[in-house]
Curated annotation (Swiss-Prot):
This is FMN-dependent NADH:quinone oxidoreductase 1. Belongs to the azoreductase type 1 family. It comes from the Bacteria. Keywords: Flavoprotein, FMN, NAD, Oxidoreductase. InterPro entries: Flavodoxin_fold, Flavoprotein-like_sf, FMN-dep_NADH:Q_OxRdtase_AzoR1, NADH:quinone_OxRdtase_FMN_depd. The gene is azoR1. It comes from Bacillus cereus (strain ATCC 10987 / NRS 248). Its EC number is 1.6.5.-, 1.7.1.17. It catalyses: 2 a quinone + NADH + H(+) = 2 a 1,4-benzosemiquinone + NAD(+); N,N-dimethyl-1,4-phenylenediamine + anthranilate + 2 NAD(+) = 2-(4-dimethylaminophenyl)diazenylbenzoate + 2 NADH + 2 H(+).
Length: 213
């Protein structure tokens, strides 16, 4: 059975004035109408839920786990939460990430989230010939991203749009090769309504593709 995981990386989790949230809501409305009633949709809100970052506590916990040492209560709590996030991610086979573009890159909490799911022997493994993704079982990824500028004109802005490059490369690395991005771009320089309508059309098509695959 298909399970869809929504990864909301917008700092204003349910801000209805947010362009990326508007586009996501349009997607979700179409998607839920198309999928069977028994399919599961889960959502993690990265700025509301606890998403551990790699800090002193996490590094110490990893070192102690490697040495077979007992963890402190704080270390135990944080590693258990990281495991929960990882298992939730692995249990899904369709993913939708919602984010605004922040200074040409992903929001900081999304980077923290990536550090929770990119775990050796869980989502990738090391081999003599290099790293290999372990999620090569037909999983699908849709990224919904809003930005004030336009990043597809093959100019300077295209070169420095690191969020899309990073996400696509990392999920391909994990084995998720069915990757699509829908951009609501140019909100600061184009007619905002036109930007929204174009994005609505794209996410509706994406919803149909994901629901029927």
């Amino acid at each position: 059975m298909n399970k869809t995981l929504i990864i909301n990386a917008h700092p204003k989790v349910d801000d209805t004035s947010s362009v990326s949230i508007k586009v996501f809501n349009h997607f979700l409305e179409s998607y839920t109408e198309l999928i069977p009633n028994n399919e599961t949709i889960e959502q993690i809100n990265l700025y509301d839920d606890v998403v551990p970052m790699i800090d002193k506590t996490v590094l110490s916990a990893w070192e102690e786990q490697g040495n077979g040492q007992q963890l402190t209560d704080e270390e135990q709590k944080v590693t258990e939460r990281m495991s929960e996030i990882l298992q939730q991610f692995k249990s899904a086979n369709t993913y939708v990430i919602v984010l605004p573009l922040h200074n040409f890159n992903i929001p900081s909490k999304l980077k923290d989230y990536m550090d929770n799911i990119m775990i050796a022997r869980e989502t990738f493994k090391y081999t003599e010939t290099g790293s290999v993704g372990l999620l090569k079982d037909g999983r699908r990824m849709l990224v919904i991203q809003a930005s004030g500028s336009i990043y597809t004109n093959d100019d300077w802005y295209t070169d420095v749009e690191y969020s899309h490059k990073y996400l696509k490369a990392m999920f391909n690395f994990l084995g998720i090769e069915d990757y699509q991005i829908v951009r609501a771009q140019g909100t600061a320089v184009l007619d905002p309504n036109e930007v929204l309508q174009n994005a609505y059309k794209e996410v509706k098509e994406a919803a149909s593709r994901l629901a029927n695959k």
